Amino acid sequence: MSETMTNQNVVNEEQPFNESKHRSHGIDISAIERSMEDLSIDNETIALEVNKLKLFYGEKEALHGIDLSIPQKRVTAFIGPSGCGKSTLLRCFNRMNDLVDGCRIDGQILLEQEDIYRKGVDVAELRRRVGMVFQKPNPFPKTIYENVAYGLRIQGINKKRILDETVEWALKSAALWDEVKDRLNDSALGLSGGQQQRLVIARTVAVKPEVLLLDEPASALDPLSTLKIEELIHELKNDYTIVIVTHNMQQAARVSDYTAFMYMGDLIEFGSTNQLFTNPSCKQTEDYITGRYG
């Protein structure tokens, strides 16, 4: 799959890769090489399979025949310039694009070999299984406790013991419990931006999803809060498949196992983060990660 994918929807002009240029743009290639396993998509269990996916806004085609495999319990990063289709593709995975007037898709997205766009799919259940965290923290105007318990109550879970245990577990999973355990009845709106984002992650994992979609989850946060989110992503991938959209290539290099580079609605290149950042197959990829455009 990896070799086939890398050569689909690509510009085939290749040039020798100049590693020193990456260091000049702040990406420590040696650190990536030291930290990454020798990954291959061929050896992975696949969580999400994208087959010939096209997306249209009215008559405008925004995604052009995407083929992609998202490995289970790994972090996959989508990178590329603004408007390239990263977030559009991400929102396809839990059908958030259904909410956009005039939006339609051709092709398939398979979750556990089931097409999530087939007729009769329970979209609410799909969005439980494939949770999403947005760029700007969006806590509800409720207490910290009720923010996390909200999805459970929607599912009809109201037993206090179950709610208490799940809220504590979810807040611990989001590395927030120690900071809020003595003020669970305080408003979530009083938390810092970084705490609010981790609360949103806790709210998402409380309903036991299989996949977490993160759309620029740290772009509105300060460096310390960003570091906490990145550390949390490393922890969460032990239990969840994670797909993250980021404009920050250093962040993609730090947190992801696999990276997909997109440009103008096309998937240009996909591979292990190690391979893509140290030895990209396509000149377009090299140009982007070395800062020539984007």
Swiss-Prot record:
Keywords: ATP-binding, Cell inner membrane, Cell membrane, Membrane, Nucleotide-binding, Phosphate transport, Translocase, Transport
Subcellular compartments: Cell inner membrane
PANTHER family: ABC TRANSPORTER I FAMILY MEMBER 17, IRON EXPORT ATP-BINDING PROTEIN FETA-RELATED
Ranges of residues in domain ABC transporter: 48-289
NCBIfam families cross-referenced by the UniProt entry: 3a0107s01c2
Any one GO CC term of the record: plasma membrane
Major subcellular location class: membrane
Name of encoding gene: pstB
UniProt subunit comment: The complex is composed of two ATP-binding proteins (PstB), two transmembrane proteins (PstC and PstA) and a solute-binding protein (PstS).
Gene Ontology annotations of biological process type: phosphate ion transmembrane transport
Compositionally skewed regions (Polar residues) per UniProt: 1-18
Protein EC: 7.3.2.1
Binding positions for ATP per the UniProt entry: G80, P81, S82, G83, C84, G85, K86, S87
A molecular function GO annotation: ATP binding
One Pfam family recorded for the sequence: ABC_tran
Protein family per UniProt: Belongs to the ABC transporter superfamily. Phosphate importer (TC 3.A.1.7) family.
Region (Disordered) location: 1-24
Catalytic activity: phosphate(out) + ATP + H2O = ADP + 2 phosphate(in) + H(+)
Function text: Part of the ABC transporter complex PstSACB involved in phosphate import. Responsible for energy coupling to the transport system.
InterPro entries xref list: AAA+_ATPase, ABC_transporter-like_ATP-bd, ABC_transporter-like_CS, P-loop_NTPase, PstB-like
Protein name per its UniProtKB record: Phosphate import ATP-binding protein PstB
Record membrane topology: Peripheral membrane protein
PROSITE patterns (alphabetical): ABC_TRANSPORTER_1, ABC_TRANSPORTER_2, PSTB
Class of this enzyme: translocase
